[in-house]
Amino acid sequence: SIETIRKLPKMYFTNITGGEPFIRTDLKEIVRELYKKSDRIVISTNGFFTDRIVDLCKEFPQIGIRISIEGLEQTNNEIRGLQDGYQRGYKTLKTLRKMGMKDVGFGMTVQDKNAPDLVPLYKISDKMGMEFATASLHNSFYFVEAKNIIHDRPMVAKNFENLVNELLRSNSPKKWFRAYFNHGLINYI
């Protein structure tokens, strides 16, 4: 609630996630209150509600948006259970970039089903000049989920290794730090 947000201490970074944050009718109010508490806000979304996302970004152009795309088109749509999920997310990314949003990018939770898409999806994001954030499949105490398991760890690790090598080929220190983070994910899985 807004009252709860008002009680929060000062924060450096806030990630609004879900479920899907853009189904909330009070998301603008939440963001407005959080900016009183947080220096940086990023919203993780499936990118399905392009119009709502664009509307929020017009009011808060400094906000970060990460579209959760779980692989190339077929893989993403299978994992997300949305027939046009990839295209809708991709369209939202392009729309945000076209309107001048700077803190925009892909977010991918890596698992057995999508690990082979890790480097190809990174290359798409890199070509678009966007951020590429990764996470490893994990269980959550908050959602009482204990069946998220990576079954083929060597294969997933190899794909993370390939991503690390791609990131290290760049001239960007930020990408080198992302390589370090992704190398750490190999140990986590």
Regions found by a protein language model. Name each.
Residues 33, 37, 63-70, 74-189:
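Radical SAM enzyme [4Fe-4S]-AdoMet core and its adjacent flexible, acidic
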